[in-house]
Amino acid sequence: MAQLPTKAKCVVIGAGIVGNSILYHLARLGWKDLVQIDKGPLPNPGGSTGHASNFIFPVDHSKEMAHITADSMRQYKELGCFTECGGVEVAHTPERMIELTRRITSAKSWGIDGGRIVTPAEVKELIPYIEESVILGGYYQPTVGVVDSLRAGTLMREKAIEMGAAQSFANIEVTGMDVENGRIKRVKTEQGDIEAEYVVIATGCWSAKLAKMAGSEIPLTPAVHQMKDIGPVPFFANTKGDIEWPIIRDMDTNMYERQHGTGLEVGSYAHRPILYEAEEIPSNAAAALSPTEFPFTQKDFDLQDEHSYELVPSIVGDENVREKYAINGILSLTPDGM
């Protein structure tokens, strides 16, 4: 095992999808002497990357966000970590149908092709297990897909190492930082200190905690996103991959339903705000699943269960389809909702 260096041009703290991406792109830009550290094990150090649902809808009213998303999808495809399955945003109200036509307009404006407004019957053709009588229609976008984020991160990290630009170290926790004249000069860890010209904090829901060590602030708040996986679903019995059927996005209820192998994943953003401080997130050793997978609070999901039963009753209402996995997953959110 390589010894932790005492000096580096740049220390990247964090080995989730963001930290690995930064490491890879710095290496591609010609940077050398990069050191990446994470307090968890690899390839899944225990952050949000390991449990995120990882689907991408490419359309946004913001031109900048749409273009960033398009470039991200391009890179994931190049890595071989993107599965295109299509997706349908459904509408329960006339107002939502109007919004979906606006999204089509934005898609065309930003050069995103292939999307179309679909009737309830057409939604049923695309997603046979949906209850078409409770929707007025939808917006079908065939280029929606799912990313294998752990594999993508692993490949990016490995490519940076193969370029001779980087070293990566797992199970090393940052304990402090030395700051001089407003710049981080030294990263202190359990296994020694690293002097660095540059330091990148890419630790997701722990970022605010590490920023404090540097006498600064990163406006990220650990917040719960509830999700559960139910199955096995008879309709998915012959599935060969992770996903073959379009993802359902229901913005009227702030929920989604997506196939996950032989199961159905149901996620919600409609529950009450459940917020934490970074200091409340347990260590890898103390966590039952992973540090960012908190125990599921069913009472916060009761209404969402009703919504999912209404939309996909043939699956959610099947007594033989049981809950396989459910978490209060921790994501990091900003005050402006980005």
Region locations from a protein language model:
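Dinucleotide-binding Rossmann-like beta1-alpha1 core, especially the glycine-rich loop
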Residues: A52-L126, D252-E257, G261-E265, T292
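Glycine-rich Rossmann-fold phosphate-binding loop(s) that bind the pyrophosphate
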Residues: A15-N20, K39, T203
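Short beta-strand to alpha-helix junction loop
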Residues: H67-A70, E89-E99, Y139-I161, F169, ...
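Beta1/beta-strand and adjacent pyrophosphate-binding region of the FAD-binding site
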Residues: Q3-V18, V35
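Active-site lid/adjacent beta-loop-alpha segment flanking the redox-cofactor pocket in flavoenzymes
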Residues: G86, E217, V233-G337
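Glycine-rich FAD pyrophosphate-binding loop
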Residues: A27-T49
